[in-house]
Amino acid sequence: MDISKLMQQAKDMQGKMAAIQEDLAKKIITGSAGGGMVEVQVNGQGEILAIKIEDALINTDEKEMLQDLVTAATNDGLRRAKDLSKQEMGQLTGGMNLPDLTNFLS
C-alpha cells in the first residue's frame, strides 16, 4: 500500500468536499407548514435565510399556533437541507455512509 498515494487521494477528496460544501451554501431549500402559510428558507448548510409568514397568521390570538408553525417549517427546512447534504456527500463517497468523513477531512 502506497502511503503517498493514499495521502493524495485524501487530499483530493478533501478538495471535492470543500467544493460540495461551497455549493451547498449556495442552494436554497424551503420548508413549510400550515399548508404553506409559514415558509422557512435555509441553505444547504442549515443556515436560516428567511422566514415568511402569511398576513392571516399575524394575530395575537393565534400566537401559539404561529410559533408552532414556525417551528415546524424550520424543522422541515433543516431536514430537507440535511437530506440534500447527505445526497451530495453520497456522490463523493459512492453512497457509503461515512458520518465522520466530514469531520476528518475538514
Swiss-Prot record:
Coiled coil: none annotated. The keyword Transit peptide does not apply. One of its GO terms (cellular component) is bacterial nucleoid. GO terms for molecular function: DNA binding. InterPro entries: YbaB-like_sf, YbaB/EbfC. Pfam families: YbaB_DNA_bd. Gene3D superfamilies: Nucleoid-associated protein YbaB-like domain (3.30.1310.10). Its main location: cytoplasm. It is found in: Cytoplasm, Nucleoid. Disulfide bonds: none annotated. Keywords: Cytoplasm, DNA-binding. Homodimer. NCBIfam families: DNA_YbaB_EbfC (TIGR00103). Binds to DNA and alters its conformation. May be involved in regulation of gene expression, nucleoid organization and DNA protection. Belongs to the YbaB/EbfC family. This is Nucleoid-associated protein DP1429. It comes from Desulfotalea psychrophila (strain LSv54 / DSM 12343).
